Regions:
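Extended two-metal-dependent nuclease catalytic cores across DNA- and RNA-processing enzymes
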Residues: 2-131
């Protein structure tokens, strides 16, 4: 996207009922993760527009991810049906599977189906850690 397109998009979004936040030196994904967990926005329906699977760990009853290229919404139910993994445990599952776009090697020959089969409790809302 060219800079003049970004400026035009910014101006267009400014006229819409869409909250925009930008902070110098802070990556957008970190900012989005922070905002989603703020008490101020509790009770709001939040939609993250991105094709990045990293945002799946932020999905909740109040937060969904819209994937524009696939034209799909990802919700808690969608993740449970699709991957058998609850969003609270999605980061742990992705760490096992790996993610080339994030230079995360993962465990060889392990995919989401295998993770869900070996660790069925990751479908629970209780958050598990790698420890």
């Amino acid at each position: 996207m060219k800079i003049y397109q970004q400026i035009g998009l910014y101006e267009y979004l400014y006229e819409m009922p869409i909250i925009q936040v930008a902070i110098d030196g802070i990556e957008a994904d970190d900012l989005i993760g922070h905002i989603v967990h703020q008490d101020y926005y509790s009770g709001w329906q939040k939609i993250i527009v991105s094709s990045d699977k990293d945002f799946f760990q932020l999905v909740s009853d109040e937060t969904s991810v819209y994937r524009p290229i696939q034209d799909t919404f990802i919700s808690v139910i969608t993740l449970l049906e699709q991957d058998k993994i609850h969003p609270n445990n999605y980061a742990l599952a992705r760490a096992m599977v790996g993610d080339k776009s994030d230079n995360l090697a993962g465990v060889p020959r392990i995919g989401m189906k295998t993770v869900a089969k070996l660790f069925p409790y990751l479908s629970e809302s209780k958050q598990y850690d790698a420890d």
